C-alpha cells in the first residue's frame, strides 16, 4: 500500500528472457490507469451499494460513484429515511447535464413514516431523471402515482414498475420502449393500461403480473411490434374475477405465457407468428364447475382460443388446461396443431388417458415431455381405451418419478406400443420402487425396434 493508503489491484509479470533483469519482476497497476469513463461503464452493471464498496479501493475513485450514469438503490439499505433521501439528492445534483442510463429505486414502507412526503419526493426524482433522458426506469414504490411526464419520455427503453399507480394519460408517446414489466400495478381503469401498451411503438416484451384490485376488467393488448407476452392473473379466487377478459391482438407475437384460472375469456387475434406458448388456464372451471356442452358461447370461446394457438411450434400445457381441452373434445373435434413439434404436458395423477385425445390433433409432434400433478377435485370421467398412433413421435421423457403403479405402466405401454419411429424414451424412477418398475418396463413390447429406453 502506498502513502495514500490506496489498495491497488496489481498484476505481476515476469520479465522476458531477453530482459537484462531476468530474475526480477515488475507490477503494473492496470486497473488504476483505466479511463474513468470505462470504469463507470463497468460499475454500471453493479448495484450502487456495490459500486461504493469498490470505490474504496482507491482514493482516486472515492467520489466516482456520483459519476456512474445510473442509480440502483433500495431504501432498506439505509437505517434512516432522511439519509436515503439525501443520498439520492446528492447523486442527482451531480453532473446534472449528463444522461442517465438507469434509475432503479426500491421502497421500504417501514422506513418511511409519512407516505405522502415519500411519494412527493419520488415524483420529484422521476421528473428529474426523465429530464436527464433516462433509458431504464425501475421503481418499486407502494401507492405512488406515476407522474404524467413518464408517458412522454422519448429516451425510455425499459419500464419496470411494482406496486405503483398508473393514472389515466392524456397522451402516451414512448417511441423507444422495448420492455415493460408491470408487477402488482394499480390502474385508473382499463383504458390507462391499454393506452400505455399501444403508445409504445417498438415494444418487444410485455410482462404483466396483476394485483387483486387493479381496476382492469377487460385487458386489451394491442401492439404491432410485440414479440413476447407473459400474463399472470390475480392470485385471489372469487366471483368478482369471473368476468375478466383478456384480448390479445399482436400480429408479430412469438412467445406467449398465460397463467390464470379465473379469467373467463382469452381472445387471440392475428396469431400466425406464434412460436412458443405456455398455457395454464381453465376458463373459470376452477370452482368445481363442470364443462357444460350446452353452453354454446363458452364452447365457441374455447374453440376460438384453441384455433388461436394452433399454429404454435413449442407448447407447454398445465393439467387444468388439458382437462378443459378433453372436455371440449367430447363435444366437437379439436383443431389440428400441424406445426407443433415439442409438447410438454401435465395431467392429474392417473388421468393420463385424456392425453391421446389431444395427441391425435398433433400429427407432426416429435418430442413429448409428460408429468403428473396432484389430483385436486372430481372431474369428468374419462373414456378409457382411446388410442391413437403416434406416427411422428421420436423422443419422450416422463419427468415425474414413477413408482410402478398400474396407471403408470399403462402410460409407458401406450407410448411404447403406439410409437413406430420412437428413438428414445427417458423415464425417471422413484428410488423406493426402482427395481420393481425397471422389471415391468423392460418387459413392455416396443413398436419401434430402434427405441432406446433410459431409466434414471
UniProtKB/Swiss-Prot annotation:
Q: What name does this protein carry?
A: Putative F-box/FBD/LRR-repeat protein At1g66300
Which positions are tagged coiled coil? Answer: none
Spans annotated as Disordered: 1-23
Location of the FBD domain: 377-429
Tell me if Repeat is a UniProt keyword of this record.
yes
Q: Which domain of life is it from?
A: Eukaryota
Signal sequence region: none
Q: Keywords for this entry?
A: Leucine-rich repeat, Repeat
Q: Start and end of every F-box domain? A: 28-74
Keyword Transcription belongs to the record: no
LRR-type repeats, residues: 136-163, 185-210, 234-260, 347-372
Amino acid at each position: 500500500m502506498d502513502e495514500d493508503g490506496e489498495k491497488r489491484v496489481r498484476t505481476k509479470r515476469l520479465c522476458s528472457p531477453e530482459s537484462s533483469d531476468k530474475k526480477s519482476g515488475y507490477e503494473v497497476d492496470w486497473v488504476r490507469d483505466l479511463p474513468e469513463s470505462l470504469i463507470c461503464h463497468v460499475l454500471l452493471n453493479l448495484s450502487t451499494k456495490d459500486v461504493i464498496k469498490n470505490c474504496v479501493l482507491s482514493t482516486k475513485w472515492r467520489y466516482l460513484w456520483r459519476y456512474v450514469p445510473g442509480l440502483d438503490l433500495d431504501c432498506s439499505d439505509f437505517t434512516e429515511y432522511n439519509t436515503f433521501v439525501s443520498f439520492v439528492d446528492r447523486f442527482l445534483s451531480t453532473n446534472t447535464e449528463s444522461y442517465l442510463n438507469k434509475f432503479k429505486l426500491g421502497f421500504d414502507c417501514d422506513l418511511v413514516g409519512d407516505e405522502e412526503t415519500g411519494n412527493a419526493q419520488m415524483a420529484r426524482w422521476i421528473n428529474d431523471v426523465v429530464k436527464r433522458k433516462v433509458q431504464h426506469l425501475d421503481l418499486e414504490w407502494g401507492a405512488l402515482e406515476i407522474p404524467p411526464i413518464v408517458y412522454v419520455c422519448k429516451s425510455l427503453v425499459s419500464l419496470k414498475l411494482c406496486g405503483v399507480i398508473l393514472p389515466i394519460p392524456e397522451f402516451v408517446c414512448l417511441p423507444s420502449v422495448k420492455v415493460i414489466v408491470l408487477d402488482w400495478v394499480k390502474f385508473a381503469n382499463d383504458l390507462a393500461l391499454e393506452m400505455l401498451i399501444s403508445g409504445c411503438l417498438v415494444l418487444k416484451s410485455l410482462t404483466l403480473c396483476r394485483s387483486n384490485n387493479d381496476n382492469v376488467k377487460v385487458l386489451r393488448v394491442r401492439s404491432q411490434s410485440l414479440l413476447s407476452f407473459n400474463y399472470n392473473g390475480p392470485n385471489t379466487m372469487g366471483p368478482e374475477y369471473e368476468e375478466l377478459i383478456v384480448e390479445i391482438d399482436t400480429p408479430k407475437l412469438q412467445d406467449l405465457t398465460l397463467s390464470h384460472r379465473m379469467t373467463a375469456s382469452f381472445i387471440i387475434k392475428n396469431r400466425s407468428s406464434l412460436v412458443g406458448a405456455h398455457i395454464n388456464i381453465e376458463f373459470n372451471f376452477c370452482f368445481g364447475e363442470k364443462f357444460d356442452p350446452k353452453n354454446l358461447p363458452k364452447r365457441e370461446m374455447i374453440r376460438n382460443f384453441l384455433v388461436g394457438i394452433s399454429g404454435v411450434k413449442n407448447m407447454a400445457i398445465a393439467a387444468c388446461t388439458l382437462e378443459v381441452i378433453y372436455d371440449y373434445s367430447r363435444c366437437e373435434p379439436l383443431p389440428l396443431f400441424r406445426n407443433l413439434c415439442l409438447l410438454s404436458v401435465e395431467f392429474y395423477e392417473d388421468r393420463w388417458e385424456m392425453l391421446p385425445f389431444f395427441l391425435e390433433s398433433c400429427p407432426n409432434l416429435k418430442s413429448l415431455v409428460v408429468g403428473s400433478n396432484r389430483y385436486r377435485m372430481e372431474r369428468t370421467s374419462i373414456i378409457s381405451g382411446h388410442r391413437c398412433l403416434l406416427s411422428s413421435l421420436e423422443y419422450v421423457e416422463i419427468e415425474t418419478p414413477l413408482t410402478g403403479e398400474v396407471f403408470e405402466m399403462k402410460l409407458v405401454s401406450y407410448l411404447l406400443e403406439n410409437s413406430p419411429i420412437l428413438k428414445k424414451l427417458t423415464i425417471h424412477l422413484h428410488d423406493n420402487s426402482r427395481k420393481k418398475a425397471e422389471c415391468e418396463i423392460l418387459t413392455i413390447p416396443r413398436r419401434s425396434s430402434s427405441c432406446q429406453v433410459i431409466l434414471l
